[in-house]
Amino acid sequence: MIRLLPWLNVVTLGGRSIIDQGLGAVGPVVGELREALAEHRMLILTGPGIRARHILGVGLDLGLPTGVLAGLTSVEAEQNGHLIAALLAAEGVSYLPHTAVGHQLAVHLAASRAVVSHGYPPYGLYEFPPEVGKIPPHRTDTGAFLLADAYGAARTIYVKDVDGVFTSDPVAADGSRAELIPRVGATELLAMNLDTLPVDALLLALMSRAKHVTEIQIVNGRTPGNITKALQGEHVGTIIHVD
């Protein structure tokens, strides 16, 4: 199998965990990405955040099907993508729709060190129906992974507001008992059946079928330097690997 863009770094910014937190979270993250442009070429992807939950709530009340819900929530992720691209515009970074990311990413990255898009997969109306209910099963985390694997990216990094995967919820009442899991296999992690995960469980299931990406990294974007370290290949946060 040929890696189309073996130098590519896919960096996914959590919608709720980073972008929804406002300037205090977004500003330092964007600043760190800006500094990294000199050494790394990146595809920066965004999630929809809390607004997606509002849309899903209204859409479910209206009886909308899964495919329509997927399209509506992806619009919110796109809005966040435009925001991040605007903050990096001075460096020549722009927002690309999925059609351009799918067919013209290489030429855009030849002109600029990074581009921004949203992480929702382009299934839209053709989204797979879930086993239960109507909520789209493929969301930002899985969409970003599918893009990274399709291009054979060097690194796939998820920027959240937690230090990685914990044995229990670190912000719960008994969060002091939570222990960070520095490295774990995807299948092993699924088998743990943890109450909370910083990424979609479906992403872990997809990893076993990946062609190129054999591990992903979850880092805390609220800690200065974590994104830079991950881009440089250092072990920060949690690394989930194919097992």
Protein language model regions, located:
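C-terminal catalytic "cap/lid" subdomain
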Residues: 1-243
